[in-house]
Amino acid sequence: MGEKMAEEERFPNTTHEGFNVTLHTTLVVTTKLVLPTPGKPILPVQTGEQAQQEEQSSGMTIFFSLLVLAICIILVHLLIRYRLHFLPESVAVVSLGILMGAVIKIIEFKKLANWKEEEMFRPNMFFLLLLPPIIFESGYSLHKGNFFQNIGSITLFAVFGTAISAFVVGGGIYFLGQADVISKLNMTDSFAFGSLISAVDPVATIAIFNALHVDPVLNMLVFGESILNDAVSIVLTNTAEGLTRKNMSDVSGWQTFLQALDYFLKMFFGSAALGTLTGLISALVLKHIDLRKTPSLEFGMMIIFAYLPYGLAEGISLSETCVFAFLGLSIFSFPHKFEISFVIWCIVLVLFGRAVNIFPLSYLLNFFRDHKITPKMMFIMWFSGLRGAIPYALSLHLDLEPMEKRQLIGTTTIVIVLFTILLLGGSTMPLIRLMDIEDAKARRRNKKDVNLSKTEKMGNTVESEHLSELTEEEYEAHYIRRQDLKGFMWLDAKYLNPFFTRRLTQEDLHHGRIQMKTLTNKWYEEVRQGPSGSEDDEQELL
């Protein structure tokens, strides 16, 4: 059934201060990616000139990828350096990718060089190398209190909402194709495309939310949905691909649905269990092995646990901003098949599927929520359905025949991603101000104070004021004991958190004070003994 498939798991993680990994790794459901394996288990070893050419090509590919990432880092630095905070980093990097792709295309057209293989973005590179730290950072910077307080709403939007959107988009594409309005796709291919295009990635929108200080509940609903939504979208896409690879000609529609449901549940809950188990093990390891005095070892252990579940899922068959540069490059890198009617109808279906997802579920949730989701918040949530790196990489990974169908899906996905990032993402800030979503303090801010840089805010959690001002002991004394927590929140605060996290001892506090005093004295001596009147030193002090 799954012998010819290798699967990859998305492992989210989040920690307390001091890099202690806790139970809260479950806040991002891990997923697997079904990747086709080679037909032969062992590839023949190449020698001679062919091996040398392959080695040179691999070296150039690595060089080109690192060069793109380095240029992206420099671009983000320049945005911060010159305070271009009004421009989201994802939009800037996409524009950079488009520019680089155009330059490479001109060079190839002039026959000065041929970098077609080197500039080609491989989906395996994204899922195996770039995706783990992206998901890890999302979980690491997430405030667990706000997340678990809204876990029911977030799960409903991420799981059922994504499924609704996938069925609406996939069903619409299938029936429009049968009516000869657009190119025909079979049911499984339509559902696969509907699933991959339902993965939201509101990077620019979250940056705007943080800059304008919108309602924390709105911020958390959009951010939390985007984390879990990616997982559900990947699993749904894998489910459709798994059905495509099977011989479904003699199977009824009801049996197909049951097989798809069985495949989805196994992947979804199996992935979540594997990610949770890995997170708990990492929490216990970091609790009982104190690596804080050796930061290099601590950092290495964190990287290992971030990547570990991916390799484990592969074996048992079970930085996002820079990715946008490859998305821009792909405009000129891949052969495209552009069909205007297909693109327009897909955009309409994506927006309609998002509306069918957000508005009915929000009205349903308001019957059970104390903090109601207002109509303005619903509209912003619908408008925040940007697409990003996940749909793009999944579209490259789809194994569709004939090739024209695959090119059509890939081209349409790129257009939808660029449409949502540039148009919807670019108009989110004026829309929020027009609808008066931001708080009173944010309205008094000057436009120059608005900061859309994700990098500058890296590591800052989305948190509530009544939680951010409390230490662990104060939180336990004033919040847990007084508020009478129930359900999982009580279980987490009472048992799981103390068991899986390491509290600071008096000895730790003593060593911390000594280290801080030593560093302060050292810094003071360096400043006092430095050359007086140096403009460089004065600039550093400023």
Curated annotation (Swiss-Prot):
| Sites bearing Phosphothreonine, chain numbering | 471
Q: Which residues carry this modification: Phosphoserine?
A: 532, 534
| Ranges in coiled-coil conformation | none
The superkingdom listed in its UniProt entry is: Eukaryota
Reactions accelerated catalytically? Na(+)(in) + H(+)(out) = Na(+)(out) + H(+)(in)
Transmembrane stretches, start-end: 55-75, 79-99, 118-138, 151-171, 186-206, 256-276, 306-326, 349-369, 374-394, 412-432, 446-466
Localization terms from the record: Golgi apparatus membrane; Golgi apparatus, trans-Golgi network membrane; Endosome, Multivesicular body membrane; Apical cell membrane
**What is known about what this protein does?**
Na(+)/H(+) antiporter. Mediates the electoneutral exchange of intracellular H(+) ions for extracellular Na(+) in 1:1 stoichiometry. Acts as an Na(+)/H(+) exchanger in the trans-Golgi. Contributes to the regulation of pH regulation of Golgi apparatus, and consequently, in protein trafficking and endosomal morphology. In germ cells, plays a crucial role in acrosome biogenesis and sperm development, probably by playing a role in the fusion of the Golgi-derived vesicles that form the acrosomal cap. Can also be active at the cell surface of specialized cells.
Q: What is this protein called?
A: Sodium/hydrogen exchanger 8
Q: What is the lineage of its organism?
A: Eukaryota, Metazoa, Chordata, Craniata, Vertebrata
